[in-house]
Amino acid sequence: MSEPLFLQSVMHEKLWGGRKLRDEFGYEIPSDKVGEYWAISAHPNGVSTVKNGRFAGQKLDTLYAEHRELFGNRSEPVFPLLTKILDADDWLSVQVHPDDAYGLKHEGELGKTECWYIIAADEDTEIIYGHAERSEERRVGKECRSRWSPYH
């Protein structure tokens, strides 16, 4: 195959989402609270569809299963990437994700090893990574007593 695959992908509304995907990047969005654009996805909650060429109309998960040669003959049982573009217009929740081994064993799907590339950010934007507590119990207790919100 000598041409790239262009994908029709899925938008996900989030309480913390915004309009930047439309206003700054030109995407058509279904509401003013779009938080995630799953640009490349074979995840059951939002599978990309091929838009062009001989595979037009085919779902990415099916294409991966039936034409592994297009993906370098990868050995993972399911397509191994989920590429998202986020619009975080408000605070995000604390995130804890399993690795692939734990995810497959306990949740039936791959884990979520992450890599971030910040495209744009407001001047007062923060990323909080890690913590200074000496025990997990103290860290979790401190988080629960501070700004805990079931909606973040």
Region spans (language model):
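Positively charged, low-complexity/disordered segments
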Residues: 141-152
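Transition-metal
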Residues: 1-133
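A short, charged helix-loop
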Residues: 135-139
